[in-house]
Regions:
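Formylglycine-dependent sulfatase
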Residues: 1-418, 423-446, 459-460, 471-501
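Long, compositionally biased
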Residues: 465-470
């Protein structure tokens, strides 16, 4: 799992960033055009690990759930994890026999933080020659070796914290992308959409969402704003490129040990690209060291989530749509490179792993009051058969709500009045049909409230009061540039919370 990746960031999903390792996995595996996450870091991790919606599972405490590590460990698997945890306690408290990484939601890529752990013990980050994306795979390879030494099948969960802010890149990766983003976000987004259609990930007649009012046209930015934004995208691209390189090291290790063809590899992101601009601008800066970093960019987040609208946290397609790649040559019955248009969700991962791993998902636990798993096994899709989902896919983070039922999507921005879209011919959610389909709207709202009560067991959500629509939609943490903005005075020395423009 990667962190804050845009839907179109990687090559096989339309991106210009060089991701040959992921592209090869996709070419020899299966891609999903409609794989969903929860639009937020910790809640997606809960769903990935438990097969439940976050609140149903007991949120970060996991008080009503078991994890995939616990399930597969019981079935005889060697269980290991590296990277970002972002939940309560530690991975070693939830079935992982080996763990390296940080318990926090984000950290400096070069110096880490004080939450790093190795197998339940505090781990001191080295003073030099450290970068989290690389370290995650260093330890992943070590854990795979340990699994082989005890002759056990393995379950490895690698949770990269890239490309989550702070935006930090290794010098060589950063240098590779200098000069590649001078054209700006409008042209990059157009190119990505064209490539997505050419690849067949999206239909050729799809109408993309327009540039929203809070995103300035690239040619309307002043020179220093363009320079600053170019630098941010160069850094993001470098971070994503590095993730791909490290995935390549994992794949090479599996191949060397004759395990690649019979290993299920799943690649997903926890949410869409992040728009929250929480740092003052820096000019003439290279974020290739611990002292210099950038915050996220709303403009690039819009382009990176192409062709959709909105972002991390929002339950619109831009927030919840993730690349979804499965590589398993010995198990997949689909054609190499095939694309499935069947909707899937992170809640389906645990049931799928338990199904193929011949493991039982328990209904009782000595210290937790378990609730039913909401996800279903994706075996039919992997075997080139239709998938039947009896219940809609429930969508929620904080006050962003939604429901996916067949081709229809109910969605609310920050608890504002409900909107309704037919994704069969409007995946980018351009035409709100709430007024034209009042009965369908009401039925879906009632179903969302019912699931809030019966599945999540949340009275608060079930009785949520919707607010009037805000036009245009806004967020105080989105980047807002104006012609009157002055260049930062201190350039690379600028620090602190982003000031409201």
């Amino acid at each position: 799992m990667v962190d804050d990746l845009g839907f179109s960031d990687i090559g096989c999903y339309g991106g210009e960033i060089e991701t040959p390792q992921l592209d090869k996995l996709a070419a020899n595996g299966l891609r999903f055009s409609q794989f969903y996450n929860t639009a937020k870091c910790h809640s997606s991790r809960v769903s990935l690990l438990t097969g439940q919606y976050c609140i149903a599972a007991g949120d970060v405490a996991l008080t009503h759930a078991v994890t995939s590590a616990e399930v597969l460990k019981e079935a005889g698997y060697f269980t290991a994890m590296t990277g970002k945890w972002h939940l309560d306690k530690e991975p070693t408290d939830f079935g992982f026999e080996r763990y390296f990484g940080h318990l926090s939601g984000a950290c400096n890529f070069f110096t880490g933080d004080n939450t790093f752990r190795l197998n339940g013990e505090k781990w001191q980050v080295p003073e030099k020659d450290f970068y989290t994306t690389v370290a995650d795979v260093d330890f992943a390879l070590k854990f795979l070796k340990e699994a082989r030494e005890v002759s056990k099948p393995f379950y490895l969960y690698v949770a990269f914290n890239a490309p989550h802010a702070p935006l930090h890149a290794l010098p060589d990766d950063y240098a590779k992308y200098k000069g590649r983003y001078d054209q700006g976000w409008d042209k990059m987004r157009d190119a990505r959409i064209a490539k997505l259609k050419k690849l067949g990930v999206l239909p050729k007649d799809l109408q993309e969402s327009p540039r929203p009012p809070h995103i300035r046209a690239w040619d309307k930015l002043v020179a220093w704003q363009r320079d600053y934004e170019i630098n941010r995208m160069v850094t993001l691209a470098a971070m994503i490129d590095r993730v791909d390189q490290e995935i390549g090291r994992l794949v090479d290790d599996l191949r060397k040990n004759n395990e690649l063809d019979n290993t299920i590899i799943l690649f997903v992101s926890d949410n869409g690209a992040c728009p929250f601009d929480r740092k003052n601008p820096l000019l003439d800066a290279k974020p290739t060291n611990a002292q210099t970093s950038f915050g996220d960019s709303t403009g690039w987040a819009w382009a990176r989530n192409a062709p959709f609208q909105f972002y991390k946290q929002n339950q619109f397609e831009g927030g919840i749509s993730t690349p979804g790649i499965i590589h398993w040559p010995k198990g997949l019955k689909t054609k190499p490179g095939e694309i499935s248009d069947t909707p899937a969700h992170l809640i389906d991962v645990l049931p799928t792993l338990a199904d193929f791993g011949k493991a039982m998902i328990p209904t009782e636990h000595p210290s937790r009051k378990l609730r039913p798993v909401s996800g279903i096994s994706l075996r039919p899709i992997l075997e080139a058969k239709p998938l039947v989902r009896k219940e809609p896919i429930y969508l929620q983070f904080a006050k962003d709500y939604g429901l996916r039922n067949g081709d229809w999507k109910l969605v609310s921005f920050k608890g504002q009045q409900w909107e309704l879209y037919n994704l069969a011919n409007d995946r980018a959610e351009n035409v709100d049909l709430a007024d034209k389909e009042p009965e369908r709207l009401q039925a879906m709202v009632e179903k969302w409230r019912e699931m809030s009560q019966t599945v999540l067991q949340s009275e608060k959500l079930a009785n949520a009061v919707m607010k009037p629509a805000e036009v245009p939609k806004s967020n105080r943490e989105w980047t807002v540039f104006s012609d009157s903005d002055k260049p930062p005075r201190n350039k690379a020395k600028s620090r602190g919370k982003k000031k409201k423009k």
